[in-house]
Amino acid sequence: MDLQLITTEMVVEAYGDTTDGISVFKGNRRVGYITGLKKDLAKQVKRKTTIKEYRNRRLEQARDMLPDAVEEMKVFLENQLAKYDCEVFINQTQPNVHINSCKCYIIVNPLTGKHRLGISNPNRSASDMAEDVEACFKISKSPAEHHILINGLSQDDIVEVIKTLCM
């Protein structure tokens, strides 16, 4: 943001309560000079704008890549789990696997290649499943008794975890 567009009122609103025309005060304490605070405010606005633009670019990129990544994951799962009696399908937007009364859903992240896997196994508790998963994976708590959510998995890791927890 251009320094000339930043008004004294904007600086006072961002940093303090009152001004004497030179400094900004919060209560009885001087926060800083208006000129210095204008520079700081301009940097903050520019930083926020840059971050927002980057985030929007990444989000748009992910949206564009998601359909292909989901289809690729579905084909990969079908190939890897072909010898097991399972159903691989896309439920709304993400791939799912139903195998041996387990329901597995994958949340695909096309940008990083690290995906999330949720498994609902009516025959095992979440704590039992967590014990069988390697310690290097991040496991999120779930309020459901027979559900586990594992973060940061590659495609190969997903297949191995499904085999471990659902076979």
UniProtKB/Swiss-Prot annotation:
Q: Which residues form the signal peptide?
A: none
Q: Which biological process, per GO, is one annotated for this protein? A: symbiont-mediated suppression of host gene expression
Keyword DNA-binding listed? The answer is yes
Any one GO MF term held by the record is: DNA binding
- UniProt keyword terms in alphabetical order: Bacterial host gene expression shutoff by virus, Bacterial host transcription shutoff by virus, DNA-binding, Host gene expression shutoff by virus, Host-virus interaction
Q: Name one Pfam family in it.
A: ALC
What InterPro entries does the record point to?
A: Host_transcript_inhib_Alc
Briefly, what is this protein's role?
Answer: Participates in the host transcription shutoff by causing premature termination of transcription from host DNA. Acts as a site-specific termination factor that abolishes transcript elongation on cytosine-containing DNA but not on the 5-hydroxymethyl cytosine present in the viral DNA. Therefore inhibits as well transcription from other phages that contain cytosine in their DNA.
Q: What is this protein called?
A: Protein alc
Source organism: Enterobacteria phage T4 (Bacteriophage T4)
